[in-house]
Amino acid sequence: MMESRHAQRKNEHLSLAAKYYDQVHQHHYFDQVRLIHDSLPEMTTDDVDLHVQLADNLEIECPFYIEAMTGGSDQALKINRQLAQLAHKHHLAMATGSLSIISKDPQSFSSFEIIREENPDGIIFANLSANASLDQAINAISLLKANALELHINAAQELIMPEGDRDFNWLDNIQYLVSELEVPVIVKEVGFGMSKTTIAKLQTHDVHLINVSGRGGTNFAAIENRRNHDINFESLLDWGQTTPESLLEAHSIRRGKTEIIASGGITSPLDVIKAGVLGARAVGVAGYFLNILQNEGYEALDQTLGEWQVIVKRLLALLGCSSFTELSRVEYVLGTDLLSYARQRHLR
């Protein structure tokens, strides 16, 4: 049976993400962050606890997790099944791709449902657009028995997308969903990063979990521009803030019980640690894990996830930190470009 045009678009996204993977990873922005070594950590690896408390009712067993990738097609179902199996095995949280498609193509739900089937007791974040209705949000959470809801904000992607939305009045709806839902709400960019202005707006609208999702990983500007045969948005291919820049922005404005999550261009356990040093409470990884799964296979990703957990724990011990949250006290220096950005933005 031929898949719907919505499912075909999801397959296009997967294909183009793979096509542009090497291109978007030519620049590794976390190289602009250097950690200061202390030769006397006074710590054992047994002292390290990887658990992270993101909210009163949301704890994850490891500071990095499998970030939102895909859903809505047969190909996505296969990918989500494998990712969910690995999330279950390694006790990792996992975010779904956008569930917005199920209101237009109800048959696509099986590609999301498989995540809960393969990981019945794990931490799962459902994912919807920031303009989702309360009924859509409640339905998505209920169908997946989700532990949290990600609301993605993706104005740049939508504007480049030929069939994208053109209305970005999101803040009031976000605040309404936060107030009405029983699970924590994470507001997430999709690879364009956040400024301190954005983060301040979210905080004043009662958002306390913010994923800055910076430039450096999957590039939806490039993906949607390739799909757009009418207008060329090539000038926006490097639009937005990188993940380190976004974390510095967040650190300058974060207040109260707001917790920052990082994603975008995370390709190593050291990147996870550096994100924590810059203020992230947790770190999402999507493109890097998907690339391994698609090109090297299930067993290779299985091995990678296990190794990352071991390395993150050992790096925490090396830095004298018994938990991921203690990374905020680790000293660091910035490379020339990132330091210049921070000074011009009055971030340090």
Curated annotation (Swiss-Prot):
Substrate binds at residues 9-10, 157. It catalyses: isopentenyl diphosphate = dimethylallyl diphosphate. Its EC number is 5.3.3.2. The keyword Flavoprotein applies. It is found in: Cytoplasm. Mg(2+) binds at residue 158. One of its GO terms (cellular component) is cytoplasm. FMN binds at residues 68-70, 98, 127, 188, 213, 218, 286-287. It holds the Pfam family FMN_dh. Homooctamer. Dimer of tetramers. Belongs to the IPP isomerase type 2 family. This is Isopentenyl-diphosphate delta-isomerase.
